[in-house]
């Protein structure tokens, strides 16, 4: 009597799928950070440097899918067994350093993001007041928008961007009369205008060189009119009705609102010319150790050429060397705060509403020639404040690139994991890839 053939089994079951809503709220608050770091050290020593949270999906468990197990017949359905373990890309040690910097700066309402701009992977995502200043909401972008205006200038007419702007009086004040180039006054080129955040120059360029269509298309290409990642608001740009509206839009005086995560994605564009969706979840595992498939991230896309990205970073170094952030990146004795590391950055500040206060930004990447770290800081300041956003960012860069009195670009690998042979934090997905690589048979020896 012939025995029936066993069910064909050639591969493990497909990964269960995670609902994106479960992953839209990383542990940004101090309370959730402390809980996540405790849980990260309780289950897997190899993942200790990364933050971990547990999720009980309850009735919202992933849909059943067809799978197999030796204990059940092939094709029988199974479900993810909760609670689920969410393993973040957020680095415990770096996040603790960021919290210390914010505490020393007495930050009441503010956010800090540290990102690997080459991949979009978040290394720290901190929010001092999730109720008063939610990290997923859009706020006035202030002069950060000048980076996009400068990119548009370099695209439209590289020679024009090398020419000078002429302005009179206070470079930060713009009115209808100051939208046109005066017959005489002080001069500034694009690099100097970026470094000093010259509103008159950027307003003139917006009106006479770029126009509304080019500015709005640039905002759209940079991803500023869409959500930067799941769970975050889309950016928005107000309608332009007058020349003054256009000038204020291009200089950042009004009209554009974005989340800090939009600005974090900008660091990726500055690094390689490509928009990359920021992400903060490495993997999700059920109670049986089965990985769940994560929602697919948006495809990266080219926004500007790598040549323009390189040129922008070179210009933005002037901000930290002799521009609006010069004092933040120097010690009281005038020495570089992060010696040997050039930092490209941009400041921004603007009074706004909803909520009311002074919005102060800093965005930067380092090392400027080959960025591995991006930092974004946003504060909402009241009548009293203790530290500028550029000062907070400078200390975050110092914590990333310095150890004791030694500062070196390679020290960032403590958090990004780039340094060969470095036995530090690795993502579980990195370990899986390493296991797969080590399991491959060695190549055959060449024939004599």
Which positions does each model-derived feature cover?
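Short active-site loop at a secondary-structure junction
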Residues: 86-87, 108, 130-148, 161-166, ...
